[in-house]
């Protein structure tokens, strides 16, 4: 795994990066805080059994905000990742306007059809577009999960319907 995170306004992003890496280490893994995207460094870190924890950063302009969704997408594509997982405040793609249930999985073609007939909040559309970009650029699956749910990752991966929505290119790519 590779962790890309956002840093709340007013918080030192490098200190936050170190804090997240330390939290992972307290869970029994090795983690290393990294700034920026360098595929060779990521491969080296992973091959030495470390989890890279990345804070999006522009070395030339540290005050410039870089969207972690953009960074995560770039890394997933460059690393030829199998999965890209966005932890958000959304539980996934709602099946209807009542927001009572989400699609456990949906193809990119089905997403395009939904976008023609349904209105999605602007910030959710950003997640959805990043997922679509990911699957069209070679990532097999892109997940939208509610990061506020405790144990959301194991629920997503070890239950039949999961905990959110996985966007796939087509049905054949679900279990590649």
What feature does the model see in each segment?
Residues 152:
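Anionic-ligand-binding alpha/beta catalytic cores of soluble enzymes and soluble regulatory domains
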């Amino acid at each position: 795994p590779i962790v890309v995170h956002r840093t709340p306004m007013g918080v030192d992003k490098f200190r936050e990066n170190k804090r997240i890496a330390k939290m992972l280490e307290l869970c029994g893994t090795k983690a290393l805080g990294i700034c920026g995207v360098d595929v060779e460094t990521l491969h080296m870190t992973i091959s030495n059994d470390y989890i890279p924890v990345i804070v999006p950063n522009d070395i030339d302009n540290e005050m410039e905000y870089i969207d972690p969704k953009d960074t995560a997408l770039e890394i997933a594509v460059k690393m030829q990742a199998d999965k890209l997982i966005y932890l958000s405040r959304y539980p996934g793609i709602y099946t209807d306007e009542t927001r009572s249930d989400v699609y456990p999985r949906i193809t990119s073609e089905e997403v395009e059809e939904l976008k023609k007939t349904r209105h999605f909040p602007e910030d959710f559309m950003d997640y959805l577009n990043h997922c679509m970009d990911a699957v069209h650029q070679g990532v097999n699956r892109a997940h939208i999960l509610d990061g506020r749910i405790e144990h959301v990752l194991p629920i997503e991966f070890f239950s039949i319907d999961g905990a959110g929505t996985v966007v796939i290119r087509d049905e054949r790519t679900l279990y590649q």
